[in-house]
Amino acid sequence: AGGTPKPVPLRDDLTLDPAVVEEAITDDTAMFVVNSPGNPTGAVSPEADVREFARIADEHDVVCLSDEVYEPFVFDGEHHSPVSYADTDSVVVVNGCSKFYSMTGWRLGWVTASTRRIERMLRVHQYIQACASAPAQYAAEAALTGPQGVVDEMRETFEKRRNLLLDRFAEMGVEVPTPKGAFYAMPKVPEGFVDACIDRGVIVVPGEAFGDGGAGHARLSYANDTEALREALDVM
């Protein structure tokens, strides 16, 4: 759409600093993106920061696009959305079934926004994709209206795996900003760590794949079987 991304640095705990976001805004800024709980970091924005994101969007008349696909997977504290604190329609929320219900391959998500913004999105959307498939829509309806206990079980399982990962990295002497949500971690790793893991059959992603700020880190996903995670940690 002709936009130019402008990366901003994260804090040491890998959360997004509202002050840094606001400082980066210019007259040409149309939108900034918030992702909490986050991929690739697992970071969760505290409520005070989320309130600030809403204020920034309101006062600067820019869109805050809040990616909340990992919403149910918060281990420490609660999930907060900037749309809850906005005084205007400057916050747009995207979400989906991929993470909530392990429906990644079904490709079904949604946008929550004001009527005027949805109408503008539809002008583009209708020429890109006619609609989500009928089976995906029926499956999503069943997931959204059915018992949610399975989501709670997933969150509890992810938290146990996170704790396992943190304990093992502590034993290794590797620094890991504590992920408070999603199912990712980004430890600080020595040079050659990623290649060494891959050579030994453990898939990790170099932090640089997510931008210059990821240098010196590796992204790990613990959305895997616990025993497989133990084996991977043994290799590391």
PLM ranges: what are they?
Residues 1-236:
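PLP-dependent class I/II
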